[in-house]
Amino acid sequence: VAMAINRIAAARANLWIERSNFFPSIGLNAGWTRQETSGNTSSLPQTTDHYYDASLSMSWELDIFGSIRKRVKAQKENFAASKEEYTGVMVSLAAEVASAYINLRELQQELEVVKKNSASQEEVLKITEVRYNTGLVAKLDVAQAKSVLYNTKASIPQLEAGINQYITTLAVLLGMYPQDIRPVLESGGTLPDYMEPIGVGLPVDLLLRRPDVRGAELSVNAQAALLGASKADWLPKVFLKGSFGYAARDLKDLTKSKSMTYEIAPSLSWTIFSGGQLVNATRLAKAQLDEAINQFNQTVLTAVQETDNAMNGYRNSIKQIVALREVRNQGIETLKLSLELYKQGLSPFQNVLDAQRSLLSYENQLVQAQGSSLLQLIALYKALGGGWRE
């Protein structure tokens, strides 16, 4: 972010540098001169003279053929492009913060799923222990129930480590210390429930929302202006030069009207030979314009690809969530039925174990799908340059 801000400041300074060429350059000169001429170079005797002088001098290039004007336009486009770059950086930063937050909430929700399933598995373990103590089942059922429970609890430390990692990541992205935001984020929270279809408008409108596309277009405009300025350098340059001041032998006479001097000197400068410098400068500007056009085309293609991928990914993730919710609901029903049949001695304990493992897997998949859907939504936000209009 700081680098993008610095580039904006540099582009603004370059713009003002070019704009300054619209104005005359004015200088102040003052001095004292003592001059002695040789008596052996002419028939005139050797003389010594001295005088004081003070004057204002001016030099002004008249932008007849638009060289300065085109260079100012190029810097205006570059300045605007630097602001688009800053916008792009802020969009990316917002997307990174949102993604880290979603990943954090996803892990926290997975942790809740694990704890909830652990509690359910502990209840099943108690049931098997009661049935074992009454001689209704073998000790194998107890051992298998413990195995499933301990395996579920074993994932808790890894989830807690991931949660801590994302809290630290968020702190860095926000420019804060982890301990400053940990109390807020450790309290837990659910994933936002958003599954609405999104209308993004026409493709052309879509592309114009992206800062990188707008920036690439501005860069093309800047290079086109520089090519025009390079061609204008082939034409004559017109200058208006002049000076106004005072000169006198005695300092006390310096400001008298008879001491006034001035000079007005319009001039024309036209380079007719430069060893190929002008030709190659134009070729360079043309090559840089072609490069900017190619970069613009590539940026547009990348924008279309990223947006299409994000949109399709989001739409498919919604379908996956709907399907996984049905699977999860059936998993809950399966565990309930298998446990009831087991209690009645009508079904082996293996069916209960399979139902427990499946339900844990289904609920984790559902949480992960919800997190993935939100990440696809964030990717779509980024691909559209920071949002969309319905």
Per-region residue spans from a language model:
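Bacterial Sec-pathway N-terminal export signals of envelope proteins
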Residues: V1-N14, L191-N221, T271-I272, V300, ...
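Sec/SRP-type N-terminal targeting helices
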Residues: A2-M3, R19-S20, L62-M90, L140, ...
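Small/polar, glycine/serine/threonine/aspartate-rich low-complexity segments that form flexible
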Residues: A30-S57, D180-G199, G228, K241-A281, ...
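Periplasmic alpha-helical coiled-coil/stalk elements that build and connect Gram-negative outer-membrane
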Residues: I68, E77, K83-L202, G313, ...
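Short segments within alpha-helical structural elements
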Residues: E122-K126, Y150-Q179, S230, S317, ...
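Structural signature of alpha-solenoid helical repeat scaffolds
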Residues: T134-V137, T302, S347
